[in-house]
């Protein structure tokens, strides 16, 4: 093969790979509900507004990742690193007879 043809095939492959990645990203995005129109019955409008509210909640929610992993990590850190043994804690000097 000619070097020019190989570079074109590489560029074409990279472009197809980028399009494939972009299409995978757009599939995960929720689809906006369609407006039924101004003369739609009240039931259709109620369904539309409910779907629209759900759509807005989906696209504007905060994403923190898995909810269980920070709790596990916090527990692990607090138990292993921050836990003090009982002999390192200062002893109380409180004497109830002095009061």
Swiss-Prot record:
It comes from the Eukaryota. This is Pro-neuropeptide Y. The keyword Methyltransferase does not apply. Belongs to the NPY family. GO terms for molecular function: neuropeptide hormone activity; neuropeptide Y receptor binding. The keyword Lipoprotein does not apply. It is found in: Secreted. The modification Tyrosine amide is found at residue 64. The gene is npy. It comes from Paralichthys olivaceus (Bastard halibut). Residues 1-28 form the signal peptide. InterPro entries: Pancreatic_hormone-like, Pancreatic_hormone-like_CS.
């Amino acid at each position: 093969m000619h070097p020019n043809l190989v570079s074109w095939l590489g560029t074409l492959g990279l472009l197809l790979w980028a399009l494939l990645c972009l299409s995978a990203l757009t599939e995960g995005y929720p689809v906006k509900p369609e407006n039924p129109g101004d003369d739609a019955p009240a039931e259709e409008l109620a369904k539309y507004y409910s779907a629209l509210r759900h759509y807005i909640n989906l696209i504007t929610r905060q994403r923190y990742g898995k909810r269980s992993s920070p709790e596990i990590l916090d527990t692990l850190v607090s138990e292993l690193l921050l836990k003090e043994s009982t002999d390192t804690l200062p002893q109380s000097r409180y004497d109830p007879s002095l009061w």
